[in-house]
């Protein structure tokens, strides 16, 4: 009986470990008006923003949509991450948004932390009416919702703070995936 409990406990431990996602937030571009950060999953070589663009190489069926997103990123880089540039996708107050604001086949998800700080996640083809119904998009948005919650908590307890366009403090996170 004791042996069985150990096996079950070990199996539960392995299961829990396999459902844990480690990642960080890294600065990827500095502009006069805003800094762009991106989620970087621990096991991946590229940031989530880079992985998004890798999915849609030049000459793909979504060139026009990618051009629209790039135009928005250029505009945000020049003017800042103003609220009117984003389509809100998360819960009230979490800052989770999508680019572009106009109708498009693609969504790039991000956290608008302020007019001066934007944190990118990943995104993809809008294959359902809402991100909650999409297997691929829901994973990206849920990661950002959790990240927003982690950042808010750290800002509140003083282990993370914002100075102008910089996020200062521990930008490493561990997330239990909800599968």
Give residue ranges: language-model regions.
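Active-site beta-strand-loop-beta-strand hairpin of nuclease catalytic cores
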Residues: 111-120
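Basic, Lys/Arg-enriched alpha-helical interface segments
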Residues: 2-105, 127-179
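Short, surface-exposed charged micro-motifs
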Residues: 107-109
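Acidic/polar active-site rim loop that often engages polyanionic ligands
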Residues: 121-126
């Amino acid at each position: 009986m004791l042996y069985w409990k150990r096996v079950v406990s070990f199996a539960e431990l392995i299961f829990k470990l396999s459902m844990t996602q480690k990642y960080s937030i890294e600065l990827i571009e500095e502009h006069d008006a805003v800094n762009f950060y991106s989620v970087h999953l621990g096991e991946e070589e590229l940031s989530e923003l880079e992985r998004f663009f890798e999915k849609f190489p030049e000459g793909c069926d979504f060139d026009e949509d990618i051009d629209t997103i790039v135009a928005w990123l250029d505009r945000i880089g020049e003017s800042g991450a103003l609220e009117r540039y984003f389509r809100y996708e998360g819960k009230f107050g979490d800052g989770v948004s999508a680019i572009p604001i106009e109708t498009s086949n693609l969504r790039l998800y991000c956290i608008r932390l302020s007019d001066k700080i934007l944190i990118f996640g990943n995104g993809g083809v809008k294959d359902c009416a809402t991100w909650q119904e999409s297997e691929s998009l829901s994973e990206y948005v849920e990661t950002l919702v959790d990240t927003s919650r982690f950042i808010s908590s750290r800002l509140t307890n003083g282990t993370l703070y914002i100075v102008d366009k910089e996020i200062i403090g521990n930008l490493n996170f561990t997330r239990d995936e909800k599968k």
